[in-house]
Amino acid sequence: MSLRYALLGLLADRPYSGWQLLKHFEGSLAYAWPALHSQIYPELARLREAGLIEQTGEGPRGAKEYSLTPSGREQIERWLRETTPGRNTRDEALLRVFFLWLLDPDEAAAYLDREAEFQRRLLADLERIAASPGPDDARERSYRLALDFGLRVTRTRRDWAEDSARAVRAHSPEAPQPRRNRRA
């Protein structure tokens, strides 16, 4: 459902072709809500059928260009005002950590090292984005808030992965121990 609102939000800025929207999902939105070509185009068709967007012309290379309708604008504004975001995020990296006990400690630590390295690279990308100036307008301020969130989460994940790898290697009692009888 959030792909719908990501598309509506992008189209609230200006008309885009499907290809241009895909580039946003491969770029700035990749950190928050990645989406594939195979997801974007069917959702655009559903949005058009629902009267939330309309085809307004042709973009580069003859691609269909879409614009937000007044109903689409109302829908995204209502979503921003009224919807409580779901907190059930899927995190494959964390799911794997849950089962690291199946590996020997060296393999488990190596996995955590790779996770820490991934977070370091992601952090470098985000810091590079943060260092580039943008206009002082409401849109940029919103982008910067999301970027700040990404920076903080990425630093925390990097630190956690580094600390966890060290703890696993040392067979340290500081390594988080699973509690028995966990509630689902």
Show the residue positions of the predicted features.
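Secondary-structure edge/capping motif, primarily at the C-terminal ends of alpha-helices
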Residues: 101, 130-137, 168, 172
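Amphipathic alpha-helical dimerization/coiled-coil segments
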Residues: 78-128
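Heptad-repeat amphipathic alpha-helical coiled-coil interaction surface used
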Residues: 109, 116, 123, 130, ...
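Long amphipathic alpha-helical coiled-coil segments
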Residues: 167-184
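Amphipathic alpha-helical coiled-coil segments and their boundaries
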Residues: 105, 112, 140-143, 147, ...
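Structural signal for well-ordered, non-membrane alpha-helices
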Residues: 48, 73, 120-127, 155, ...
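Acidic interhelical loop/turn segments
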Residues: 127-147
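Basic helix-turn-helix/winged-helix DNA-binding cores
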Residues: 1-89
